[in-house]
């Protein structure tokens, strides 16, 4: 996602070099890039990042603590406003059109979210919008959550002491449906 681009260091180059397609997961950064969060507002209960799940709470704290992620969200929102689409559609389109990405999985808790996000499959961001998003979200080594600390902090929650919450699926209203968007070859 625009909020977590560490795969660009090795995974995408390796996939391109070996002609391997990638399945992108969590392109909305667990909902952070949906446009539903504001600086200083925190996560509302009933949202994925506002759930009682230790894992999503840690992920949310990581996203909310990053000045770069807030700048990225502002960039996504600005481009969405200019294009007359939603921030979710911009974030989904950006991920789906990354090099080597052949499919994208995203989640929707409600039918409204699903219906709002589906048009992203037909949205093609222009070069200028893509360049702006690339610039504002550019990964930097060891800059959480762009580097290994984001993964190690989530992995640390999977220790036996926290296993009951970290490895359980969120209950309603944090649950939902995951969808797979497949890009046609050559599109």
Task: Show the residue positions of the predicted features.
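Beta/alpha (TIM)-barrel catalytic core signal, keyed to glycine-rich beta->alpha loops juxtaposed to Asp/Glu
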Residues: 1-136, 159-160, 171-175, 179
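Acidic/histidine-enriched, glycine/proline-rich intrinsically disordered or flexible terminal extensions
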Residues: 144-169
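Serine residues within intrinsically disordered or low-complexity segments
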Residues: 168-171, 187
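Short, intrinsically disordered C-terminal tails of secreted or membrane-associated proteins
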Residues: 178-186
């Amino acid at each position: 996602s625009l909020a977590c681009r560490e795969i660009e260091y090795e995974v995408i180059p390796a996939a391109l070099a070996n002609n391997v397609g990638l399945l992108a997961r969590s392109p909305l950064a667990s909902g952070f890039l949906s446009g539903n969060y504001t600086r200083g507002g925190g996560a509302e209960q009933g949202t994925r990042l506002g759930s009682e799940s230790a894992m999503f709470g840690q992920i949310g704290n990581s996203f909310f603590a990053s000045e770069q992620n807030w700048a990225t969200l502002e960039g996504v929102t600005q481009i969405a406003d200019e294009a007359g689409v939603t921030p979710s559609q911009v974030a989904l389109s950006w991920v789906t059109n990354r090099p080597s990405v052949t499919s994208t999985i995203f989640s929707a808790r409600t039918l409204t979210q699903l219906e709002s996000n589906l048009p992203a499959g037909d949205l093609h961001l222009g070069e200028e919008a893509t360049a702006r998003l690339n610039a504002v979200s550019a990964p930097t080594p060891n800059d959480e959550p762009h580097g290994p600390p984001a993964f190690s902090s989530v992995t640390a929650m999977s220790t036996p002491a926290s296993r009951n919450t970290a490895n359980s699926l969120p209950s309603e209203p944090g649950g939902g449906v995951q969808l797979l968007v497949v890009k046609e070859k050559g599109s």
